[in-house]
Regions:
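Core catalytic lobe of class I
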Residues: 1-220
Length: 221
């Protein structure tokens, strides 16, 4: 009885949580928070300006297609076409950034095709009015591998800044205890390891991320 009851609740919830019906050009604004969600083309300047409604952003997080043909959702373009498209949306996003803003861009590297588009994208960004601040690697919750290679489980995140945005360094400190000892060094004639020299017993977040819950876009979660 309990199992049947749980299944009934599951299906009722599934029926109630229907996907929003968006058509191209539609923008929905949350009446409580003011958040705006649009079905738009990021490579079109007028679409980006329509979503921003005259406002500027202090933070932008972009997760474009990686130009890797991994399923039926996204194909892959010739690299020159992909880069031309990328340059359009990058310019549009930079235009709506505040004078002091942070820009995070997820990217991928196709090991079967010269690691494109990651290095090409990074070179393109050198000519943009933003500065690279960090090259972050995230360890995915799941990966894929073969019997003849290391499992592919990493994902790249580029962190750029425009102007001089605030960076809250205190937010980097976690409650995770340090575990790895080593890095021995002589201080005042005494051999010490990094635990003894550290000002904190917990880990400070760096540019390698792990244990972050992911939402997989092919799953209804």
């Amino acid at each position: 009885m309990a199992i049947a009851q749980n299944q009934d609740i599951k299906y009722r919830i599934k029926d109630e949580l229907k996907m929003p019906d968006f058509n191209y050009g539609d923008i929905w604004e949350d009446p409580k928070s003011g958040h705006r969600i649009g079905c738009l083309d990021i490579s079109k300047k007028e679409d980006v300006e329509k979503l921003m409604h005259g406002q500027k952003a202090v933070l932008a997080v972009q997760d474009p297609p990686y130009n890797v043909d991994i399923n039926d959702e996204f194909g892959n373009l010739p690299l020159n076409q992909y880069m031309a498209w990328s340059e359009k949306w990058v310019d549009n996003i930079i235009d709506i950034l505040d004078a002091n803003a942070s820009l995070y861009i997820w990217s991928g590297a196709d090991v079967k095709n010269g690691l494109q588009p990651l290095p090409d994208f990074m070179i393109m960004m050198r000519d943009k009015p933003v500065k690279i601040r960090s090259f972050i690697t995230m360890r995915n919750q799941r990966g894929y591998g073969t019997q003849k290679n290391w499992m592919a489980i990493r994902q790249e995140l580029l962190y750029y800044v425009k102007g001089n945005p605030i960076f809250n360094v205190q937010a980097e400190y976690t409650d995770i205890l340090k575990k790895t000892k080593g890095y021995y060094k002589k201080i005042n004639g005494k051999i010490t390891e990094n635990f003894e020299r550290s000002k904190s017993l917990t880990i400070r977040a760096g540019n390698v991320w792990h244990d972050i819950q992911q939402v997989f876009y092919l799953m209804h979660e």
